[in-house]
């Protein structure tokens, strides 16, 4: 690959470079010096308290969000196969399948985390797609054609529940020690691997 200046080699994605150097050092001891230098050049690991994990972050696995939804909205066991969180990398959109599976009698999704017009699953889906929930009514215009108008009161109520869901996620995400370790590691790998070049 040729020679590189130390300041260039010890900058950029130093985590990936360290993995490559460690692999090379397994068969060629000359690379041990690279491993040592790159180990010292690694960025400081961020801790959970320094990481802001938000609903809708595309780096979160759907399984994490599924677990949050299942635990927080207390989905009955017999319905867990029907209510799923999915992410499409093609459209960059989150979908909650089975939004109406629990029915209107579900107090948690229709009152605690939702409203009579937007249940918790609909609000979660909007939140995952980084949208503010909006509730519309259909009325007839002067020509008798249907027209959608924003229902300000219902929208305000739904947006309050949206904030309740965001707060619940912020409290939930770091509670489990294994989940915390996995998410911190994943975040550091994805977003804390780069070191700026320092010119000598």
Identify what each model region corresponds to.
Residues 189-200:
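ASCE P-loop NTPase motor core, strongest for the SF2 helicase catalytic module
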